[in-house]
């Protein structure tokens, strides 16, 4: 038997071992965040640009969430279709006030349990039986791609889910297509993202919305956790 066969398994240097321990600690901390109340923080699940994911700023997500709550009414049902930032704000601020579902292609959002509904816009009406048609007071939707095909297919889903009210967030270039497909009009409010986008982004609604009052929306004061 050679000397090399007697050496045993390779040993990590103290530097490599410390780096590995730090990595495991970070992973454990991240896992703890995903299991606790912090799982509703925007950015707790990182953007995947390959899926065209760009999160709203906390201020914008809050404005959209509050407008959706006002539109849905007390005890209302809200569907967030490809709009996870809005879902997270709804759950953070109105955990007991409204019922919310998050429709997402990205299965990482399955951490939200029964709220999560797997959704692929390419199969717009392929939804689980537990999701009844026209069962949501408002649908908040953000098509992942700026194309008429994507908007047209997602519009099928929106019309299948909503009882009437629609809050659509997409590029300004989709204004005519959005009006044609969903009967929505552009709001004055200008949404912002955590990263600067190359295209002008706007909100569109088909109801009397606070988002249409001003370019910046006054955020309501929250009286303690809910």
Swiss-Prot record:
Keyword terms: Acetylation, Cytoplasm, Methyltransferase, Phosphoprotein, Transferase
UniProt keyword annotation of Transferase present: yes
UniProt main location, coarse: cytoplasm
GO biological process, one term: peptidyl-lysine methylation
E.C. number(s) listed in UniProt: 2.1.1.-
InterPro entries cross-referenced by the UniProt entry: DNA_methylase_N6_adenine_CS, Efm5/EEF1AKMT1, Mlase_EEF1AKMT1/ZCCHC4, SAM-dependent_MTases_sf
Keyword Transmembrane helix: no
Modified residues (Phosphoserine): 2
Record localization: Cytoplasm
Cellular component aspect of the GO annotation: cytoplasm
Catalytic activity line of the entry: L-lysyl-[protein] + 3 S-adenosyl-L-methionine = N(6),N(6),N(6)-trimethyl-L-lysyl-[protein] + 3 S-adenosyl-L-homocysteine + 3 H(+)
Modified residues (N-acetylserine): 2
One Gene Ontology MF term: methyltransferase activity
Family: Belongs to the class I-like SAM-binding methyltransferase superfamily. EFM5 family.
Known function: Protein-lysine methyltransferase that selectively catalyzes the trimethylation of EEF1A at 'Lys-79'.
Name of the protein described by the UniProt record: EEF1A lysine methyltransferase 1
Organism: Bos taurus
Gene: EEF1AKMT1
């Amino acid at each position: 038997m050679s000397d090399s066969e007697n050496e045993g398994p390779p040993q990590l240097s103290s530097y490599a071992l410390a780096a590995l321990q730090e990595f495991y600690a970070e992973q454990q901390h991240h896992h703890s965040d995903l299991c606790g109340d912090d799982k509703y923080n925007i950015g707790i699940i990182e953007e995947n640009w390959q899926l065209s994911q760009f999160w709203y700023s906390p201020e914008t997500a809050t404005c959209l969430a509050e407008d959706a709550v006002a539109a849905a009414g007390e005890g209302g049902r809200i569907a967030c279709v490809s709009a996870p930032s809005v879902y997270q704000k709804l759950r953070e601020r109105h955990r007991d006030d409204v019922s919310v579902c998050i429709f997402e292609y990205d299965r990482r959002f399955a951490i939200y349990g029964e709220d999560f509904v797997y959704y692929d816009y390419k199969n717009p009406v392929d939804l689980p039986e537990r999701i009844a048609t026209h069962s949501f007071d408002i649908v908040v939707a953000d098509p992942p791609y700026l194309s008429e095909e994507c908007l047209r297919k997602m519009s099928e889903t929106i019309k299948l889910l909503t009882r009437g009210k629609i809050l659509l967030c997409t590029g300004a270039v989709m204004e005519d297509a959005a009006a044609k497909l969903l009967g929505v009009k552009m709001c004055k409010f200008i949404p912002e993202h955590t990263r600067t986008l190359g295209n002008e982004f706007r909100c569109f609604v088909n109801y009397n919305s606070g988002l249409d009052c001003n370019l910046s929306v006054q955020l309501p004061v929250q009286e303690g956790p809910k």
